[in-house]
Amino acid sequence: MADVVASIRVMPDSADRDLNELMDALKAAVPAGTKFQKFELKPIAFGLKAIMATVTVDDSEGGTEPVEEAWSKVPGVESVNVEATGRAF
């Protein structure tokens, strides 16, 4: 099977949330079989920033669902959305 690179947007529940702590919690919650690549912060509006995460997963059935489910349960996370996917080379 090939690897798939996914760009995932994680929205914090508040503009006041400590994003460094949230990124540490997200990294700790990466499920088995998922390779964490990087985080970037993206300004949204009124001081709110999204965490853009890049991960690599197998192209098996379910794909990014384990990551989405695990990260949705992290305290301080409002939403988790896959922005883009593509094959890794």
Curated annotation (Swiss-Prot):
Family matches, as InterPro entries: eEF-1beta-like_sf (IPR036219), EF1B_bsu/dsu_GNE (IPR014038), Transl_elong_EF1B/ribsomal_bS6 (IPR014717), Transl_elong_EF1B_B_arc (IPR004542)
Keyword entries, A-Z: Elongation factor, Protein biosynthesis
Pfam family name, one: EF1_GNE
Gene Ontology molecular function, alphabetical: translation elongation factor activity
Similarity comment text for this entry: Belongs to the EF-1-beta/EF-1-delta family.
Role this protein plays: Promotes the exchange of GDP for GTP in EF-1-alpha/GDP, thus allowing the regeneration of EF-1-alpha/GTP that could then be used to form the ternary complex EF-1-alpha/GTP/AAtRNA.
HAMAP family for the chain: EF1_beta
The protein's name in its UniProt record: Elongation factor 1-beta
Organism annotation: Methanocella arvoryzae (strain DSM 22066 / NBRC 105507 / MRE50)
Classification of source organism: Archaea, Methanobacteriati, Methanobacteriota, Stenosarchaea group, Methanomicrobia
